[in-house]
Amino acid sequence: MSAREVHIDVNNKTGHTLQLEDKTKLDGGRWRTSPTNVANDQIKTFVAESNGFMTGTEGTIYYSINGEAEISLYFDNPFAGSNKYDGHSNKSQYEIITQGGSGNQSHVTYTIQTTSSRYGHKS
């Protein structure tokens, strides 16, 4: 077990496949389970872990939707300090609900959905 880990669930509720972009990166650590495309109505789990003495893991996963919208999912589990998570879409019709935990072996769930789905109807 690594000193720091982030178990990342990506829950796709967009109606489209999330296409992994090449600019997905780790600023610290390594992938134990690398990100991949995520089909609609699927949940995929990826794991990033620290790789070295007194280090954490940090990175951003980038997805595109139909080559139009871009989704970014940021995570940081530092060796010292608080964990941070953030999700962002460059198109207002998609939102990211981020639920992240604390601790050295943390878990975060990013649910990517159409903005209207929170009101019980699809666009």
UniProtKB/Swiss-Prot annotation:
Component of a binary insecticidal toxin active on western corn rootworm (WCR, Diabrotica virgifera subsp. virgifera Le Conte) and probably also on northern corn rootworm (D.barberi). Both proteins are required for maximal toxicity. The larval midgut epithelium is probably the primary target. This protein alone is also active against southern corn rootworm (Diabrotica undecimpunctata howardi Barber), but its activity is synergized by its Cry35Ab1 partner. The 2 proteins individually and together form ion channels; channels made in the presence of the 2 proteins have higher conductance. GO terms for molecular function: toxin activity. GO terms for biological process: sporulation resulting in formation of a cellular spore; symbiont-mediated hemolysis of host erythrocyte. It comes from the Bacteria. Monomer in solution. Copurifies from parasporal inclusion bodies with Cry35Ab1. The lineage of its organism: Bacteria, Bacillati, Bacillota, Bacilli, Bacillales. Induction: Probably part of the cry34Ab1-cry35Ab1 operon. Belongs to the aegerolysin family. Iodination or fluorescein-5-maleimide modification makes the protein non-toxic to WCR. It holds the Pfam family Aegerolysin. Expression of the 2 toxin genes in transgenic corn confers resistance to WCR and has been commercialized. This is Insecticidal crystal protein Cry34Ab1. Keywords: Sporulation, Toxin, Virulence.
